[in-house]
Amino acid sequence: MSAQPVDIQIFGRSLRVNCPPDQRDALNQAADDLNQRLQDLKVRTRVTNTEQLVFIAALNISYELTQEKAKTRDYAASMEQRIRMLQQTIEQALLDQGRTTEKTGQNFE
């Protein structure tokens, strides 16, 4: 799908960006989130300079993204470790079953 121009409002300023039609809702949601963050920052920090507010918001969003990436990386590493442990457990159980079958002469097929 080709991107189409979309007009959005960010903190009272109009921006035209290209966006695929199927991602327009996500873009609007992101714009709403950014507007809310900027408004919250303006109230909390009493900073009135829009450029400063945008930079602070960008830093906050970047920090949050970095934290989420770290969580995802840690979760993936944890899952890989669990999978390795499960594989070892299964392999050991199969080896034990093979030894038991050899000793008793029974076949479980």
From Swiss-Prot:
One Pfam family assigned to this protein is: ZapA
Q: Where on the tree of life does the source sit, at the highest rank?
A: Bacteria
Q: Please give the InterPro entries that the UniProt record associates with this protein.
A: Cell_div_ZapA-like, Cell_div_ZapA-like_sf, Cell_div_ZapA_eubact, Cell_div_ZapA_N
Q: What is its main location?
A: cytoplasm
Q: Where in the cell is it found?
A: Cytoplasm
* S-S pairs: none
Q: Which GO terms describe its cellular component?
A: cell division site; cell septum; cytosol; plasma membrane
Coiled coil spans: 21-97
Question: What keywords are annotated for this sequence in UniProt?
Answer: Cell cycle, Cell division, Coiled coil, Cytoplasm, Septation
Instruction: State any GO BP term from the record.
Output: division septum assembly
Among SUPFAM superfamilies, the record links this protein to: Cell division protein ZapA-like
Oligomeric state and interaction partners are given as: Homodimer. Interacts with FtsZ.
Q: Which family is this sequence assigned to?
A: Belongs to the ZapA family. Type 1 subfamily.
What biological function has been recorded for the protein in this entry? Activator of cell division through the inhibition of FtsZ GTPase activity, therefore promoting FtsZ assembly into bundles of protofilaments necessary for the formation of the division Z ring. It is recruited early at mid-cell but it is not essential for cell division.
Protein name (Swiss-Prot/TrEMBL): Cell division protein ZapA
Give the source species. Salmonella arizonae (strain ATCC BAA-731 / CDC346-86 / RSK2980)
> Which gene does this sequence derive from?
zapA
